[in-house]
Amino acid sequence: MSGPNIVTPAGREHTDIRHVDETQLIVDDAEVADDDSSELGDSIASSQQTTSSIASSIWNFQLENGRTYHRYKEKKYQYPNDEKETERLDLQHELCLLTLNRTLGLAPPNDENSKVNRVLDLGTGTGLWAIDFGDVHPNAEVLGVDLSPPAAEAPSNVGFEVDDVEEPWTYTQPFDYIHSRFMTSSISNWDQYIQNSFDNLTPGGYFELLEVGGQLQSDDNTLRPDSAVVKSGKLLREACAILGRPFQSIPSLVDVMKEVGFVDIVMTKYKWPMNSWPKDPKHKLIGTWSLHNNLEGIEGWTMAAYTRALNWKKEEVQAFLVDVRNGLKDKSMHAYMPIYAIYGRKPE
């Protein structure tokens, strides 16, 4: 199978790492006392029911503390897969599109004119990224894999498999583009994960990560260390480490990519404001979506992690999250979550 028809400088085999940080965010003082709008539903793609070739037993999910989780490889992944999480993942997909200026990624295969044949979406979630990519590239064969089956209608060139990406990869043909989004705290061995991606690419193919930094930051020291928001992040990182899938230092993955053989590596940093505290319209909008993503996701991110690893009770988690949610809305803390897009090319 031939690789994607992407023009690159002849003989370019060096590693070109570009760290791009967006300009420092300015506080919108007029908005400090206001609440973020909750009317986002009309622009969030809702999941649709469809038939599937996946065995019915896969749909037999596990109920735990009021949330459902994947049955296949039970308890390996600590985040839920129920309708509430599905809706949040769809919201998060829109947040990613806002961040990347309505593109699905920064790697060259995302150019609508690129000729890409086989594409793999790791940890596909609700499958929206794979579906969107398949719509833009109707001649590409797109495969999304996850521990839970997506429940979205897909075009004929997009398929889904329930699989564990940490097991040996058994694909019979390589891919031209492998995409991975928000897998930190879900992977136990990143060296192997990236090696598998490299090994399953065609020469000249691209691997791309979009990852969350995992720890809130502020440029003006307004993020209070004793706040419930900061405490919740520390506890989550502690729990994920105990569960064997710790949060990663995302910039360090550039070195891993270099070691396995990727070249032309580019890393771009973005900022997701904690709420709508920034003044500029783009980051204010991203902050509004980010707040809703966090408010909808915080229980799912913490419930299994805290109860399984830290031995909290369900009621303790819920009581703690009252303060966390209030903290997320606090516009006096000019916090943001760093988001990293990293891609590299397998040499010809």
Tell what function each PLM region has.
Residues 2-81, 87:
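N-terminal auxiliary segments of SAM/dcSAM-dependent transferases
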Residues 187-189:
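Short N-terminal helix/helix-N-cap motif within the alpha/beta-hydrolase-1
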